[in-house]
């Protein structure tokens, strides 16, 4: 990853997919020694269907194993977390775990991918603790309450996010590209 030391801190099952994910991630140069291998659990899976413009039509997933990524698990790695150059998280982990991470990251910038309109509400009250947010159109609308009918609305949404303390917004607009603020 651009010649930088990178770690994956996640939970995987003791199944074929978990072992494959760890092996391929290691092969790509990412350290996986902070991953939790959960016996008897399935590794997360996700499938989405996109329309011709790149907008998601529907998605299904099994993220049950992410419940094992808890504040208790993260607290075992507090020095590692606070020594990072940047933390990238998503909203698949529980709200309490996300809040713990945001409260304990110290001065480390935290980048967040909301992952869905349903899950993004976990961070609504914590935007000031997030350095960079990468929502899609629907996630940005859900968080801000502002309709994104065209690119002109992106600036209004960006102002809303920055007013609520967010440092950087990378807004995915599907077929309309990306808005960066």
Segment roles from a protein language model:
Residues 1, 102:
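Histidine-anchored nucleotide/phosphate-binding helix
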Residues 2-85:
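Conserved N-terminal subdomain of the carbohydrate kinase-like
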Residues 10, 89-91, 112:
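Glycine- and other small-residue-rich loops at beta-strand/loop junctions that grip anionic moieties
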Residues 16-19, 96, 118-121:
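Short, charged/polar "capping" segments at the starts of alpha-helices
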Residues 21, 99-101:
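Aromatic/hydrophobic pocket-lining residues that form π-stacking "cages" and hydrophobic walls in ligand
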Residues 85-86, 132:
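Structural motif
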Residues 92-99:
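Active-site-adjacent beta->alpha loops and helix N-cap segments on the catalytic face
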Residues 99, 106-181:
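Conserved phosphate/ATP/ADP-binding segment of small-molecule kinases
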